C-alpha cells in the first residue's frame, strides 16, 4: 500500500491547520469517492463515446440487455431503474431509436403503453461497449489485489446501505 500523499490529504491538512477541532475523516473518504467517481465517469464517457453513445444512453441499452430475452421494458420501468424522469427518458429513447439501437412498439397488454426493445444492432453494440467499459474499470483497479478489491467492495456496500 502506498503512503503517498494526494490532493485530498492536502485539503484535510489545510482544514486541520485552520480548524484543528474538526474530524476530517469523512472529508478524506468522500473527497476520494467524489474524485474517483469523476475520473471514472470521464473515462467511461470517453469509452462509450467510441461506440457513438453517452454514458446515459449506455445505461438505457444496458438495462434492456440485463433484463434478459426479449430485452424489453416499458419506458416507465426504464425510468424507475435509472432514476430518471419520464421526460429525461424520452430524450434518450428518441436518440437511441433514431440511431437504430432500440425500437418502441405499442404494449399488447396495455393500449396506452409502450414497450422498448433492443434491436440486433443495439444488442451487438451493447455487448461490445460493456466489455470495453469493464476493461476501463479493471484497469483502474490494477493497483489492488483481488482480496483488496473484495474488501473494498464490502466496505462500499456497507457505506451505501447506511446512506
Specify the residue positions occupied by each region the protein language model found.
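N-terminal leader segment of winged-helix/HTH proteins
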Residues: 1-51
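Short amphipathic alpha-helical segments with heptad-repeat character
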Residues: 27-30, 34, 38, 83, ...
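N-terminal helix-turn-helix DNA-binding core of bacterial DNA-binding proteins
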Residues: 24, 34, 38, 42-85
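Residue-level recognition of specific faces of alpha-helices
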Residues: 32, 57-63, 81, 92-95, ...
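Short, charged, intrinsically disordered terminal tails
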Residues: 161-163
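Charged, amphipathic alpha-helical coiled-coil/dimerization segments
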Residues: 92-154
Amino acid at each position: 500500500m502506498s503512503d503517498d500523499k494526494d490532493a485530498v490529504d492536502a485539503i484535510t491538512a489545510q482544514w486541520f491547520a485552520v480548524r484543528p477541532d474538526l474530524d476530517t475523516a469523512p472529508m478524506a473518504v468522500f473527497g476520494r469517492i467524489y474524485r474517483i467517481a469523476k475520473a471514472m465517469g470521464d473515462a467511461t464517457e470517453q469509452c462509450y463515446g467510441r461506440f457513438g453513445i453517452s454514458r446515459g444512453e449506455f445505461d438505457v441499452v444496458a438495462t434492456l440487455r440485463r433484463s434478459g430475452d426479449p430485452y424489453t421494458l416499458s419506458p416507465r420501468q426504464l425510468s424507475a431503474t435509472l432514476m430518471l424522469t419520464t421526460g429525461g427518458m424520452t430524450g434518450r429513447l428518441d436518440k437511441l431509436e433514431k440511431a437504430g439501437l432500440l425500437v418502441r412498439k405499442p404494449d399488447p397488454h396495455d393500449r396506452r403503453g409502450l414497450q422498448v426493445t433492443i434491436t440486433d444492432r443495439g444488442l451487438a453494440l451493447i455487448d461490445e461497449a460493456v466489455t470495453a467499459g469493464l476493461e476501463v474499470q479493471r484497469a483502474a483497479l490494477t493497483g489492488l489485489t483481488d482480496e483488496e478489491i473484495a474488501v473494498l467492495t464490502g466496505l462500499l456496500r456497507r457505506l451505501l446501505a447506511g446512506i
